[in-house]
Structure formats: C-alpha cells, structure tokens
Amino acid sequence: VIKVAVLPQGSVSDEAVRHLLRGLEYELVYYKLITDVCLSTANGDTDYCVVPIENTIEGSVSAHLDFMIHDMDLPIQAEWVFPPTQNLIGFPDTDLAAVEKVLSHQVAIAQCREYLKANLSHAEKEVVSSTVEGVKQVQREGNPNWVAVGTQLAADIHGLTVLAKDIGDHENNMTRFLLVGPKELNGKRSEHLKTSILITLPEDYPGALHQVLSAFAWRRINLSRIESRPTRKQLGNYYFYIDIEDSMDSVLLRGALKEIEAIGCELRVLGSYPSFNYSEV
C-alpha cells in the first residue's frame, strides 16, 4: 500500500489523486498546508505528495513551484490533469441575497469570479488556506449567511448543501497536478512522456537563453512550458523552469542537455515521467 500526502479531505487535490490512483492500493494522508504535504514526503513519512502546479484560468501556482525548487530534492514521478468543479456550498435555508461572506481558497474564488460578481457582489470574499477550510468554517459557524466555494465531496463530508453547481467561469478549466516522490509509480503507464528541468544561465553571457532554446529547436524537441522564477540569491537572478515533451531516454534530449551545460548553464533535472490526460487515467 502506497502512502500519499495530499491537501485536506474533500479538496480538489483529494478528488484528483483518487482519480489518478484508481485500481491501485493506496492510503491518503491529509495535511492542511501544501508545505506540510511536501515535507511529509521529503521526510519519508509518505511515499508521494500531490502538488497542484498549474490551472487553465490562473496559470502557474508559483508558490508551489518555488517550494519544490528550494525546499525539496525529490523527482516528479507523474503528472495528470483534472477538472476542478467548484460549487457554492451552504445551509439549505441560505438566501443568496442575505449572504454576508464567501470563504474559499484564492484560486477557487478567482475561477468563479463572474458568478460571484453576478450573484454575490454584495458579500465579503474571505481567502482561506483551502476550499475545504472554507467549507469547515461555514459548517462550524452555523450561520446561513456564510457560504463557501468548494467540491461536492467537501459538502458531503461536512453535511452541507450545494446551493449552486459548477459555478466556474470556464467550461474547459483544468488543473495540472504533479506526483512527487523518491520511487517510480508502478501500475500506471502513458504513451506521453515529459521531462522537467531547471536551468540557471551563466552570468555575462549575452544571448544565453537564445542558445538554450536553440539547442532544443534544431533537434525539433518541443517545449510545453518555460517560466522564470527567482533564485533568491540576488535581485535579477532567475532560474528557468522548462517542461519538455520528451523522455530522458531520448538520445536527442540528452544531446540538447549536454550542449546547454557546455555553454556554462547549471542544470537540474526535476523528473522524467508519464503525463496523463483526464480520460487516460
């Protein structure tokens, strides 16, 4: 049985990892904060951790990416996408016109901006640590004038009612998750393989980023993402996080990475792993 660290029971992460691990024997260990989720695996208390890393609407979850870069030294073992369905949750007798406060995670609030503007513009929006925490606070308070944005699973667990289903602004909203841990995930295979790397450019080397991209371009290696993040060492110093549509088994990719190191770049491979779409899992 594999032990997997994840954000609280009823969160989108909880729904997403259940989807990925269908058919496998696993135990979920819940933590309130993403830092604790990651550290449990880094410390050996769990085999894997689940990290939400990107969303169709909001883009990169930079804080999670930074934590993986600076505070963990474990490889990515899989990625998958999952559609987060956000709902308005409260008590059966809640009157939307009387709602005073909406509680949820900042990403969930952002994903439902248009609905909240049209239906609850009068209510205060309070950001909490997770969608589940918002649901818990509404349940604890017992006030019908408080509502939360969260999953059906969270509403069921905490005995609340879904007042409005699927209130997200975009139908094609997807969240990308990473499974991070020391060992390869057995029992799941995908034809689609990816590699993630971190590059630090050499100082005083004009055109270094162009050289890096050229190493991939002339080999016809596709990059699906490139993002700069601060190194935290000096103002203006950045890492480049790059997702590559290829496996480390590829001779072409290994050649590209050697070329990049030859121009003086520091290189760290964050993982070479299977990538699953929603229907493939």
Where are these regions (language model features)?
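Domain-level signature for soluble enzymes in the chorismate/prephenate branch of the shikimate pathway
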Residues: V1-V281
